[in-house]
Amino acid sequence: EAWYPYMEEKDLFGDLSGNIMFSKHYRYTPIFDHEHEFFEIICVYDGTSHTTIQGMSHELHTGDICIIPPHTMHSIGIFDDSLVFNILIRGSTFQSTFFQSLTADSALAHFFAHVLYRKTEGNYLIFHTFDDIRIRDMLENLYIEYLGHEKYSYTFLNSMLIMFWAMLLR
């Protein structure tokens, strides 16, 4: 069997010092349900993505960002020329960057912690950014930084993630 329906952090990140991985989602591939120990951020850069999360279907469009927490069954399908990026983040990195953005509003932090970590339906977040140019630029910069593999790139990526979360919450 080539596909594993469950993936642990060590399977993806291994001994890498990095906590964040970017990938372009392959188009025209079979849809398969899966879950994993890390966070997945689906970013629809252009076009449409058919996404099912815990049995609930969603059609994501250009500019939409979906945060899927660990241990959440989901699938993604792209069957045209759409461009979708996946950002895969270790759980500890997500917590340290995302919740650092929320320190000023403990009620909001509590809400997100509840939504993202409870084992109930709907424990994911979808942001409709309406293709906000600042968020689009940040995604591009995150991707370029990731591909560059320059010295201190993971420090930059963690810092950029904090800014990205703050932009989404605006």
Pin down the residues of each PLM region:
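N-terminal regulatory/effector-sensing and dimerization cores
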Residues: 21-109
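Detector for methionine-enriched segments
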Residues: 7, 21, 56, 73, ...
